[in-house]
Amino acid sequence: MFQSKKITLGACVMAAALMAAQAQASEATLKDGKLAIDTLPFTLETQLALGAASVKDKALVLQAKKGTDLYANTDGTEVADKTPRVLFQPTGDFIFSAKVNAGVNHPFNGAALIVYGDRTNWAKLLFEFAKTGAAGISTTVAKGVGDDAHHGVRPGDAVYLKVVRRKDMFVFYTSPDGNAWSMVRSFGLPGAASVKVGFSSQSPDGDGFSAQFSDVKFRNATFKDFWQGE
């Protein structure tokens, strides 16, 4: 009898946890040409001259055409600002994350969360396929010039990315499961209070690339743990 009650209680707990997880899952919709994600309380701005946005299984799918890139070299002589993106403009401190599924299979194809001020002031947290033949994390912070950095390999074809703002500081994080986070880098940007953030996809040397963004989460909050961004 006691064992039966324990099993029943355990099943209830598991069911409740599953329902809670499902309730937290984000849902992207595309209706009458207007894109929305229910966990983002903002009007979404789409820049799709070089790609397309669609919805599949309640996730945002961002398709990049051949030759798309967001890039600045270290002396500012080479600048590219031509990726399909979906952006919104938050205010105050925030914590923003998403799961990225990207079957990255050509060098520099990738999907990113970005912080965008203008053509010369932006930052991206990128899950991309490197020339080494492995998928990993790269970042760039551009302030007229860029500073490409590689942050190691990530196994599989999915990763969680997170962008946090506290006052004028931004912090990038990655996670294999959306629970335990690793801090990648912190930085500042000119006009930090008025930047836009969102999703981007790129295929600078490939024939095109498609990435899926799901489990999108946003809240206006100030992190208490710098190393976790929570």
Language-model features: locations:
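Bacterial N-terminal signal peptides that target proteins for export
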Residues: M1-G10
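Boundary at the C-terminal end of the N-terminal hydrophobic targeting segment
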Residues: A20-A25
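Bacterial N-terminal signal peptides
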Residues: G10-M19
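Extracellular glycan-recognition regions
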Residues: S26-E230
